[in-house]
Structures are given as C-alpha cells and as structure tokens.
Design a protein with these regions (language model features):
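Beta1/beta-strand and adjacent pyrophosphate-binding region of the FAD-binding site
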Residues: 1-12
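Conserved N-terminal glycine-rich FAD pyrophosphate-binding loop of Rossmann-like flavoproteins
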Residues: 36-54
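Active-site substrate-recognition segment that forms the wall
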Residues: 191-225
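Glycine-rich FAD pyrophosphate-binding loop
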Residues: 19-41
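Residues at the starts of beta-strands that form the adenosine-phosphate
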Residues: 3, 26-29, 212-215
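Conserved Rossmann-like nucleotide-cofactor binding loop
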Residues: 12, 36, 158
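Conserved N-terminal helical subregion
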Residues: 2-4, 21, 48-166, 170-183, ...
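Short beta-strand/turn micro-motifs composed of small residues
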Residues: 8, 32, 78, 219
Length: 240
C-alpha cells in the first residue's frame, strides 16, 4: 500500500482525502498547520456543474437541502443606473443531479470533514523540510518526522510545500485589485446578480434556503511597494 501526505486541509486537500477513503490502494494523512478549522458561518462559494459532478461522487447530493441553493440565472446590471443588461440561463448547463450550486464555504468544509476519520488530520503541523530518499521524509516544526511515498501540496496560495520542493519563495503577484466580502440578510433576489461599474464590480447571490446572501466586490486599487510586500494585508480580515 502506497502512502500519501496531504499538506493542507482546504477544499482540495479534503476532497482528495474523500476519494482516498474509497481507494484501498493508498493510505494517507492530512497535515494542517492551524490548530483547528474555522467552521463558523462564513462567506459563500459558487460551484459549477463540473464541480458538483465530482462532489456527487463522494455523496454531496445527500447534503441537507436547506443548506444549498440552486440559482437559475446570472443577471447582469449596470451598477450606476441599476438597469439590467442581460442574463445567462444557468439551468441549461445542468444535467441529472448536477446543478449549479451556491452555499456557505463552511458547510462544504463540514461535509468534506464528515467522511474523514479524525485521526487522519494532524493539526499544528508546520512543514519545514522535505528530504527525498527511497521515500519522502517530511520534517515539522515540532521535531516530528514522517515518511511517505507521495506528497500533495494543498496548502494554498502561500504554499510552504511548493517553496520547499522548488527551493523558491512564493511571491504573490498583485493585479491592482482588492476584494471586499460580506453577508446580507433578506435580499429580494433568487438569482446571482452581477453589477458592473467603472473600475469595480460586485456580486450578490443566495447561499441557502434561509434568505442569506453572499456579497463580494472587486475594486481596482493601486498599492505602494511596502503594502504589496506586507503579507498581512492579504489575509482574510473580518469586520463585524
């Protein structure tokens, strides 16, 4: 049996773990540097029909119906005058149980975690080195070491795993845009609404059957060099 180390417990890492749970040819462990996963109510996520097709292979269709939403259209608006420009019928891309879906990201994480034994996820595991012999030897900041046949880098945009493997620090590229996110209650719309403006746009869409909506805006903004190199500016900051 071959062994796999999954570094990172985001959506991609947890999805892979779900697939491996169904494959007896591999053993695996997930290493997460955080002490726990934040499953508090968070922002929304849109899942294409192709994504749902993959998720249904691990039982996503059994999700509680009240925790997901199936928008039928994307409506495009002129943000300045609030006039509708056009729309796209999303239902034309649906097939069988694979429908364009929106929900809270935290609910998707909860679903992915529900199929993974708790002892398969090792928290507080900060990877610091990888040595390649007959197997891959992983070293962590708490002085533990483990060996695996394969390693999967699923630790996100600031992937320490890829930095170690390629011996190059990952530097984000800033494209003069920032994202603003929020949650809205009781917005009168059952579809995805995209508002287009000059140097900005924002999107509002339902994330469940309880009249909760996700808001995200992309705004063009230039940063000075000191701001671009300050990684703390790129972290998720919540304002209540």
């Amino acid at each position: 049996m071959k062994s796999i180390a999954i570094v990172g417990s985001g959506i991609s890492g947890l999805f892979l773990a779900n697939l491996l749970e169904k494959n007896t040819s591999f053993s695996y462990k997930i290493f997460e540097k955080k002490p726990s996963l934040d499953l508090s109510d968070g922002y929304g996520i849109q899942l294409s029909v192709n994504s749902i097709n993959l998720l249904n292979k691990i039982g996503f269709q059994t999700m509680n119906a009240s925790e997901v939403f199936f928008p039928k259209k994307v409506n495009f608006f002129d943000a300045k005058v609030l006039e509708k420009i056009c729309d796209i019928d999303l239902s034309q891309f649906n097939f069988e149980n694979n429908r364009y879906t929106t929900l809270k990201r935290s609910k998707l994480i909860e679903f992915l975690l529900s199929n993974i034994p708790k002892d398969k996820i090792i928290f507080n595991s900060d990877l610091i080195n990888i040595e390649e012999y007959e197997k891959l030897k992983l070293s962590f900041s708490d002085n533990t070491k483990e060996e695996f046949d394969y390693i999967v880098a699923a630790d996100g945009v600031y992937s320490r795993t890829k930095e170690i493997l390629f011996k190059k620090e990952g530097t984000p590229k800033y494209f003069n845009s920032i994202a603003l996110r929020g949650n809205i209650q009781n917005f009168e719309n059952s579809d995805i609404s995209l508002y287009l403006g000059s140097n900005f746009h924002f999107v509002i869409y339902p994330i469940n059957q309880n009249n909760e909506f996700n808001f995200i805006s992309i705004v063009r903004k230039k940063l000075v060099e000191s701001e671009i190199t300050n990684r703390s500016l790129f972290k998720d900051k919540r304002v209540r």
